[in-house]
């Protein structure tokens, strides 16, 4: 059943510390984490006390941002008229150096989300959190969770140990494609390498702004290494990438491809055509002034109404309006596409469950 209510493609449940995940782990990992005294495993992409991590009026004293399901219902689902929302848990399991430890944490997070969020709120769906540092284990986790149709996407950080077009990652793409699950690439890094091409940032400001570079690099890696040739129906969703980098990237990718396409003969279509067919972006953060004229110009440069997906990014503090996560200047028809039609077309399982 299709609903006119909005579909939020990016909300973040507050994942508990390791102690809260132990019940979802094997006896071996319970003993290992306990005896080694490992409890916190938080990502540095969103430090818990950073202002951007949680809007001030959504921050509950003594609780992790996004930890309360009741608050999510009131502050996001009801406030924004959301009929369905996709949970994208951010967990240190996705960046652990130990592949098996990372896989254990990711599996525990998926089972925790299933029990504490999906089973408790019928409007919620979730992404399968996978250990991208271990593609074979990631593929196994996709197989384990895919039978639950409430899992609608595969989730991993955009900056991993190497470029995502490399065949090393293809077991993940193959498993996702087989189950018709989009792959969500979320802003964030394993920090195996500097997040910029010229070295390590000195401040969070620099690290955060540099994230758009990773999205550009990985997108071109996927194209030039033939991922979309091998998996022509696989969809990638750029989550929290910002949007305004895309028009300039499209122009430069097309221009350069025309000049050196002999190097990559398997890329038989324009990068822009591939991106418009196989890539989507969430609208928060939009990374543009709250100026309707500027927003309209950017949307016109993207030149495809299918590409943008509604997202509040709850509880992160990304947009200035307290009423609507959508940027200003969108026509009613385009706003409807972004809120409902595009998410339904991007996530096949939502067509079954919305």
Question: Which role does the model predict for each range below?
Answer:
Residues 1-354:
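Helix-coil boundary/capping segments in enzymes
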């Amino acid at each position: 059943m299709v609903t006119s209510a909005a579909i939020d493609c990016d909300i973040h449940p507050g994942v508990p510390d390791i102690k809260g995940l132990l019940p979802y782990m094997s006896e071996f990992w319970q003993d290992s984490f306990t005896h080694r005294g490992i409890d916190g495993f938080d990502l540095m992409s969103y430090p818990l006390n950073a202002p951007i991590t949680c809007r001030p009026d959504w921050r509950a004293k003594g609780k992790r941002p996004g930890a309360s399901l009741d608050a999510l219902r009131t502050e996001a689902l009801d406030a924004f008229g959301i009929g369905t929302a996709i949970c994208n848990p951010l967990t240190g399991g996705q960046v652990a150096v130990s592949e098996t430890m990372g896989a254990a944490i990711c599996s525990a997070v998926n089972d925790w989300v299933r029990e504490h969020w999906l089973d408790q709120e019928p409007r919620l769906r979730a992404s399968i959190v996978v250990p991208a540092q271990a593609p074979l284990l990631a593929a196994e986790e996709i197989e384990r969770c895919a039978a639950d149709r409430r899992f609608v996407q595969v989730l991993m950080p955009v900056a991993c140990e190497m470029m995502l077009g490399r065949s090393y990652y293809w077991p993940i793409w193959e498993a996702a494609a087989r189950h018709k699950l989009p792959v969500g690439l979320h802003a964030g890094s394993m920090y195996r390498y500097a997040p910029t091409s010229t070295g390590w940032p000195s401040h969070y400001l620099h690290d955060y702004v540099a994230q758009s570079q990773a999205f550009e690099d990985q997108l071109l890696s996927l194209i030039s290494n033939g991922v979309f040739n091998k998996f022509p129906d696989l969809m990638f969703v750029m989550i929290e990438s910002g949007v305004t980098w895309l028009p300039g990237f499209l122009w430069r990718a097309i221009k350069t491809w025309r000049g050196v396409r002999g190097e990559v003969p398997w890329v038989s279509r324009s990068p822009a055509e591939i991106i418009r067919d196989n890539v989507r972006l969430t609208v928060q953060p939009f990374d543009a002034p709250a100026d309707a004229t500027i927003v309209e110009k950017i949307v016109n440069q993207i030149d495809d109404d299918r590409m943008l997906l509604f997202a509040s990014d709850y509880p992160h503090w990304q947009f200035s309006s307290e009423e609507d996560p959508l940027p200003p200047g969108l026509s009613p028809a385009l706003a409807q596409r972004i809120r409902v039609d595009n998410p339904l077309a991007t996530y096949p399982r939502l067509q079954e469950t919305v």
